[in-house]
Design a protein with these regions (language model features):
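Short, small-residue-biased leader/transition segments that mark boundaries at the very start
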Residues: 1-4
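Cofactor-binding active-site loop characterized by glycine-rich and histidine/acidic residues
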Residues: 41-44, 56-178
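N-terminal capping segment at the start of a domain
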Residues: 34-50
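Intrinsic disorder/low-complexity segments
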Residues: 16-19
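N-terminal hydrophobic or amphipathic helices/low-complexity stretches enriched
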Residues: 21-37
Length: 178
């Protein structure tokens, strides 16, 4: 019979909440995850009259790597104090982040069909007050870098080990704030 992966040998010593964070996808699993993200992006964009398909598709690999084991997160507790932060500065790339969060269990995948519809929790731009797993409300380009630095500094001052990841676009560099 197959040997247990080394991390499973220590599973009884790790609190259940920590196990969620330690899952690491293999390269094959990351490719599959990125493909699933892209498929869900295409389905979502097809249901709304507008959207940034190219930009959303272009960050699927990055999101797959982050949510496939690099970024500490807990879908059952999206505001978990020990989580790492993701600042999606280019908020119009929400159609990439939403499927990523849904596929990781932050909310049901069926909810993706409600993007940008009245009363939805999935507005066209990321909104931390509506969508589980969103760390920063975005809209205006160029503000994410400063916000990410501020969050990282605040965490450091508090003596916390959380990491802060930033995704921003080339157009933001032209905004004069980066």
């Amino acid at each position: 019979h197959d040997a247990l992966p080394i991390w499973k040998l220590y599973i009884s010593e790790i609190p259940e909440q920590e196990i969620i964070m330690q899952e690491q996808f293999s390269t094959k699993e990351l490719k599959k995850f990125a493909t699933q993200i892209r498929m869900e992006i295409c389905k979502m964009i097809a249901t709304i009259p507008a959207g940034h398909l190219g930009g959303s598709l272009s960050i699927a690999d990055c999101l797959a790597v982050l949510y496939g084991g690099r970024l500490k997160h807990n879908p059952e507790d999206p505001k978990w104090d020990e989580r790492d932060w993701l600042v999606m500065s280019k908020g119009h790339r929400g159609p990439a982040l939403y499927p990523t969060l849904a596929l990781r269990g932050f909310f049901p995948v069926e909810m993706l069909a409600t993007i940008n519809k009245p009363g939805t929790d999935l507005p066209s731009h990321c909104d931390r007050n509506h969508t589980p797993g969103i760390d920063m409300t975005t809209g205006s380009l160029g503000q994410g870098a400063g916000t990410a630095c501020g969050v990282a500094l605040g965490l450091k001052i508090d003596g916390r080990q959380n990491k802060v990841f930033l995704i921003f676009g080339d157009g933001e560099i032209q905004e004069g704030q980066v």
